[in-house]
């Protein structure tokens, strides 16, 4: 049976929601799977943004990831909303362009960007 990214992402989102619940601000996927260019060797670049990131959240998240199939393929990052919003606006533009939402939206971030941010991102 071959790897089915959409089934896997559905399971990932379910596990994240079960683990972090109302604290989730955004879940997304980046990289080759988001672009539709994945191969058998591709890793899974997942993004989780919580309302705030606590040190214990990293341990909890790692434990959650360890329960998922294809653990060896999972990479990406976890962050708090405030930390993300403090990135440079040029980096935020690139992040928003490269991330496919699975739960939540980056519209609030995009609304704060202007053409100067877009030009600086290239």
What is each stretch, according to the model?
Residues 30-32:
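Glycine-rich beta-strand-to-loop/alpha-helix junction loops that act as flexible
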Residues 1-23, 34-41, 51-122:
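Catalytic core of pol beta-like nucleotidyltransferases
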């Amino acid at each position: 049976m071959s790897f089915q990214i959409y089934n896997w992402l559905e399971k990932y989102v379910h596990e994240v929601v079960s683990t972090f619940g109302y604290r989730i601000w955004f879940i997304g996927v980046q990289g080759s799977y988001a672009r539709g260019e994945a191969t058998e060797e591709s890793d899974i670049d997942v993004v989780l943004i919580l309302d705030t990131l606590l040190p214990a959240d990293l341990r909890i998240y790692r434990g959650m990831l360890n329960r998922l199939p294809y653990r060896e393929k999972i990479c990406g990052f976890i962050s708090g909303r405030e930390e993300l919003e403090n990135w440079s606006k040029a980096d935020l533009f690139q992040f928003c362009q490269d991330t496919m939402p699975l739960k939540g939206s980056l519209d609030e971030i995009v609304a704060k960007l202007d053409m100067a941010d877009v030009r600086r991102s290239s």
